[in-house]
Amino acid sequence: MCTIGLKKTAPTPKNKQTFYELDELYWFIGRKPKTTARENVYLMTMVSRSPRQIVGFDVAFDKSPERIQQIVDSAPAAGNYCTDGWTGYIDVVYPGQYVRNCRDKSDTFTVEGVNADLRHYIPVLARRSRCFCRKLETLRAVIDVFVEAYNKFGAAKMKFRHNRSTKSRELPFSVLDFL
């Protein structure tokens, strides 16, 4: 099994009551298979609720609890961890913190939104795309560049909304400005 290493992508959050949400999405390398076992690459993400940033991710051919444990260990410790109830999350040892294993999507809205942003902005992750990366390293590099830009965008968005004088939700910039 070929794997790509982990990367810590965001600074340690300053507030004490932090929430991290974990989720995974799948995609294909080379082409979309015609068999029933459709998934062959997993992108596992760990997202901070506030600020909305990707604090850890991994791209691999498997989504084992050991791999998720590496993502959890590479990020700063948080107060709460929320997941979507996949059984592999139960086997993960969280760093002495309270663990919430959620059985529905109500506590994972942030990470589901970030995964939707990943599929929106990265053409090779779009569901009905005909684009596929040929190598796992290429997919890793594309996601690495996007995560860096996404975290810069999130920090700029929080700073802008903190300093604004109006109640408008429009931003004078987008995530594409940070690529």
Where is each model-derived feature located?
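Residue-level recognition of single "structural anchor" positions
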Residues: 1-179
